[in-house]
């Protein structure tokens, strides 16, 4: 699914939705994303899925936690392509690239590959996702963690990357420095913000579309390999 990952960002800048200074900052730091993807591909032996930069801050709220919100710095979402075929694309938010440290950006990129592989695995097994809608952000974090493949299996050739994931995802993504910068330089300046309901990060796919997911044989074989590899303990938790 070839496309320019910066198209939506460029459109937002041209429409005056994103200040030129912020746009230039993201462009200047975009090499961190490119470097991270190359690193992840080398460590996993897989091509990274299609991705794009979402020119907004994406936050989520729940009905039972008044005044509280969580930030989605990245998401892996299903898309319907040509001939009604199912695919997945990674959405990276502009604030992540603008204000994230290298370790945080690389950890999140790696985490989204873990999401991508887990979603493909579940679709291939025709595992219809019809779970209960989580009632709180806390429940959503741990629900997300339940389904992911092991980072130490997927990225076993890059111990430093695994350490980044373990550090940034102790029990859900945490980076107070980046979160403060995002609030100060993005949210408080009223730059584009998208508010999603808490269940927006639950992927629901009709079974007829599952049958139309085209998966490269290399990915199929890698998923089987990852799933059959045992590790001593599960340390890294996973949520963006």
Residue ranges and their predicted role:
Residues 25-52:
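Zn2+-dependent metallopeptidase catalytic core
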Residues 103, 123, 127-240:
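Metalloprotease/metallohydrolase-associated module, dominated by Zn2+-dependent proteases
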Residues 62-103, 116-124:
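Active-site scaffold of zinc-dependent metalloenzymes
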